[in-house]
Curated annotation (Swiss-Prot):
This is Ribulose bisphosphate carboxylase large chain. The disulfide bond which can form in the large chain dimeric partners within the hexadecamer appears to be associated with oxidative stress and protein turnover. The modification Phosphothreonine is found at residue 330. Residues 1-2 form a propeptide. The modification N6-carboxylysine is found at residue 201. The keyword Repeat does not apply. It comes from Aethionema grandiflorum.
């Protein structure tokens, strides 16, 4: 008899409530290559043992419920249940533990981030026995990864489409984000692109409002792209935000972008949802469009250290669902982002194989089995003085996006774009000559100012700007004696 139809009627059914740990805490379990592995930060309520808390997470996110049910005997619980297989205390934190849970692959629908998250980060996060719960990391097994298309094109294909190599790409978010007419918006796009940027961008909340309907914006931005390409001889793009109230409307906007011949569209993947995002990613691959992803709403989910979900999990989910770019913080700008943690999930976005490294917040070795990579986008409160640090931190395979750092230039948009392009080219040249950007960065920018008045003006405006606030979501100081999980 197959495990799916095997029953346990002979055992008999005994109604009542029993501790989760009797069924779902299995420290002797050896994980399988096909298991989805999760690392949860668990804060039990007073009086709840960590083993019971970890087992409750495994149960409530897989096959369990609060009481024994007779229908357990109609299936093979051992085949389908989640298992809490290891628990370790969090150093320096009182009553916090990392609970490792293994999920059998058969619990999840193929190619569906929506289904995976509905189980793993579903109702269990409201469980009363837990004071707080956070999903720190997931190990996606190759067997499950292979059921996803992933990014529409990936890093190498994007570079080939743009014919741009050996440096980060430059972008700019058009400001003010709301209120411009479509024609004025297109004018701002044109000035930035002709000044030397590779991309400009719709802000995440630019959809189709009364002051600027989406079709008008698409037309004026396409005009700006073609005019700037003709003047500069470079391929240009603008992230046309296709996010809409329905999936049908979203695809309609993407179809119009394709008909205009532009290279890239955009989606807000968390507010739009993973089902919509995956649908759009499939359309983009089939029709030659790059897909830029904004992470609006992520901080609602990932900002607090003891509850929610770390962004590295959202980044992995996006790579599965599909996107060629995703915003990833800056480390040096106005938005939250610990350096080591950021570099950890940047590698998870770009690389094919990433080793476990708890010093960077990576709990599991991740093999992407040739799934295309995603370009991290550094955006938020950055300007020309940050260029050396950004080039050193993110490397060539990234997009550096300056909104106010372009449009806030005292001479206008095009000079602002020139300043950023000159600063980037100076940093790349200095790096290629063997100079240390972390040490000599400011000097490299000052030298470039001598032959670029646009850069000199930008440096003068932003010389005093700092965002020196402590990072909330930092990596735990690990005690090597407790980290025994591969």
């Amino acid at each position: 008899m197959s495990p799916q139809t095997e029953t346990k009627a002979s055992v008999g059914f005994k109604a009542g409530v029993k501790e989760y740990k009797l069924t779902y805490y299995t420290p002797e379990y050896e994980t399988k290559d096909t298991d989805i592995l999760a690392a949860f930060r668990v804060t039990p309520q007073p009086g709840v043992p960590p083993e019971e808390a970890g087992a409750a997470v495994a149960a409530e996110s897989s096959t369990g419920t609060w009481t024994t049910v007779w229908t357990d005997g109609l299936t093979s619980l051992d085949r389908y249940k989640g298992r809490c297989y290891h628990i370790e205390p969090v150093p320096g934190e009182e009553s916090q533990f990392i609970a490792y849970v293994a999920y059998p692959l058969d619990l999840f629908e193929e190619g569906s981030v929506t289904n995976m998250f509905t189980s793993i980060v579903g109702n269990v996060f409201g469980f009363k026995a837990l004071a707080a719960l956070r999903l720190e990391d997931l190990r996606i097994p190759p067997a499950y990864t292979k059921t996803f298309q992933g990014p529409p094109h990936g890093i190498q294909v994007e570079r080939d489409k743009l014919n741009k190599y050996g440096r980060p790409l430059l972008g700019c978010t058009i400001k003010p984000k709301l209120g411009l007419s479509a024609k004025n918006y297109g004018r701002a796009v044109y000035e930035c692109l002709r000044g030397g940027l590779d991309f400009t961008k719709d802000d995440e909340n630019v959809n189709s409002q009364p002051f600027m309907r989406w079709r008008d914006r698409f037309l004026f931005c396409a005009e700006a792209i073609y005019k700037s390409q003709a003047e500069t001889g470079e391929i240009k793009g603008h992230y046309l935000n296709a996010t809409a109230g329905t999936c049908e409307e979203m695809i309609k906007r993407a179809v119009f972008a394709r008909e205009l011949g532009v290279p890239i569209v955009m989606h807000d993947y968390l507010t739009g949802g993973f089902t919509a995002n995956t649908s759009l990613a499939h359309y983009c691959r089939d029709n030659g469009l790059l897909l830029h992803i904004h992470r609006a709403m992520h901080a609602v989910i990932d900002r607090q250290k003891n509850h929610g979900m770390h962004f590295r999990v959202l980044a992995k989910a996006l790579r599965l669902s599909g996107g060629d770019h995703i915003h990833a913080g800056t480390v040096v700008g106005k938005l939250e982002g610990d350096r080591e943690s950021t570099l950890g999930f940047v590698d998870l976005l770009r690389d094919d194989y990433v080793e476990k490294d708890r010093s960077r917040g990576i709990f599991f070795t991740q093999d992407w089995v040739s799934l295309p990579g995603v370009l991290p986008v550094a955006s938020g409160g950055i300007h020309v003085w940050h260029m050396p640090a950004l080039t050193e931190i993110f490397g060539d395979d990234s997009v550096l996006q300056f909104g106010g750092g372009t449009l806030g230039h005292p001479w206008g948009n095009a000079p602002g774009a020139v300043a950023n392009r000159v600063a980037l080219e100076a940093c790349v040249q200095a790096r290629n000559e063997g100079r240390d950007l972390a040490v000599e960065g400011n000097e490299i920018i000052r030298e470039a100012c001598k032959w670029s008045p646009e850069l000199a003006a930008a440096c003068e405006v932003w010389k005093e700007i700092r965002f020196n606030f402590p990072t909330i979501d930092t990596i735990d100081k690990l005690d090597p004696s407790v980290d025994k999980v591969a």
